[in-house]
Amino acid sequence: MSPIVFLHIPKTAGQGIHAALETLVGDPGRVSPVRVHTQCRAGSQMPPGYDLYSGHIDWTELDTLPPDRFAFTVLRDPRERIASFYFFLLKESRALSPEALARPENTGKRAVLELSADDYFFAGTPGWQTFVRDHYDNFYTAYLATRRMRGRQRLGGLSEAERLDRARQGAAALQGIYEVDRLQRLEQDLSARFGRPVTLAGRVVNAGEHVRGERRWPKLLARFESDASAARLAEFTSLDDVLMADLLSSDGS
């Protein structure tokens, strides 16, 4: 079969989509083992020979796959994605022991637990600020423009218009851009490709401690001590708002 590539942006209901894709592919041996970009810092994130590539991965190697591939991603209201990511890390951090929290790989989880929202997003060392901005600051724009999970710094020196233009060019290399609240189109496209019904609605994994449909963004803003900090956080969606509206409009959503 032609390869399926699911570029899973964190906190966009991707775990349920990945599980559905695994079921469709059938053979676990046909699923690429690379699920996170940090697994292969120097190696291939899209090793040849698999039917499914799915995860928080860079996609600089997309053009090495057969031209009849089906590559897609799913977007979510960028404010809700930011808030959901924050609360997910907070939940994860609370489940860790002090010893586990002290490990270097859990620096982000330790920070979200110990710091105020103001300090988590806008204080700390330059290295910490790079981490925060790479994961939260107009992530869709950076990911589509650079094809990298942590590609934001590669856009340094570009104007907002240039960043958006590069992101649109990147998106044009994909066969589908979908919205998390409207997965019917993805269901239809996958059903047509596999020749059998595909159901994605309701396959929510890692929903966290929130009522289904509850908005996370207001809850995150309420954690800020400074209105100025809350306003700065809103700027983390300024480009993504424009990009998402453009892409979903042009994609027929």
Q: Where is each model-derived feature located?
A:
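PAPS-dependent sulfotransferase catalytic core
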Residues: 1-59, 84-85, 90-101, 199-250
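Conserved aromatic-histidine-acidic binding/catalytic patches
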Residues: 5-9, 70, 174-182, 228-235
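A residue-level signal for conserved active-site and pocket-lining positions in enzyme catalytic cores
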Residues: 13, 77, 178, 190, ...
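PAPS-dependent sulfotransferase catalytic domain
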Residues: 40, 55-62, 67-73, 80-200
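Non-transmembrane alpha-helical segments in soluble domains
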Residues: 18, 22, 187-191, 241-244, ...
